[in-house]
Amino acid sequence: LVGSEMCIRDRQRYVQERIIPQYVGFDKAHQIDHAEKVIEESLKLALHYEVDSAMVYTIAAYHDLGLCEGREFHHIVSGKILLADETLRQWFTDEQMLQMKEAIEDHRASNQDAPRSIYGKIVAEADRIIDPEITLRRTVQYGLSHYPEMDKEQQYERFRKHLADKYAEGGY
């Protein structure tokens, strides 16, 4: 049990010191607070299922790291980053690594297909964080960060369309 607890602490320390700080370089809607909130929400959701909480924690921590190469394929790049992280292999099997990679690839809300596993469903749901104030703030921050050339009216239209596309009936 002592070795197991050390293993958990080592893994969490690694994620906190080496993975989470990478979010500092992303847009205002995808900073450290976003990663921490997705981890928190993912772990809450995980309590309702028979899942490996270490995998849930790790998936949530890595889910947006691919933003380092842009938004369009960030979910694919994030999965590749996780799979390429040799440090994780001291805690996870090859099969677990593949499951986590797939869950990260599947987390994107705009994906046409449902996530392949419960792990993908958990992180996808946690990433949607339906706190209205946070959702609105992140949508505005994303627009200002990625479309600085837009005036107020254009920003508002982009904001309105995004919220309708994502959260209205039939939204992704």
Regions found by a protein language model. Name each.
Residues 23-51, 62, 109-172:
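Divalent metal-dependent phosphate-bond-processing catalytic cores, especially two-metal-ion Mg2+/Mn2+ enzymes
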Residues 80-113:
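Hydrophobic, well-structured mid-protein blocks that either form specific transmembrane helices
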Residues 53-70, 74-78, 99-108:
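His-Asp-centered metal-binding catalytic motifs of divalent-metal-dependent phosphohydrolases/nucleases
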Residues 32, 36-39, 57, 94-105:
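Short, well-structured alpha-helical segments
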Residues 1-8:
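Short, small-residue-biased leader/transition segments that mark boundaries at the very start
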Residues 38-42, 73-88:
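An active-site-proximal "capping" alpha-helix that borders the catalytic cofactor pocket
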Residues 14-25:
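Generic N-terminal amphipathic, Lys/Arg-enriched alpha-helix
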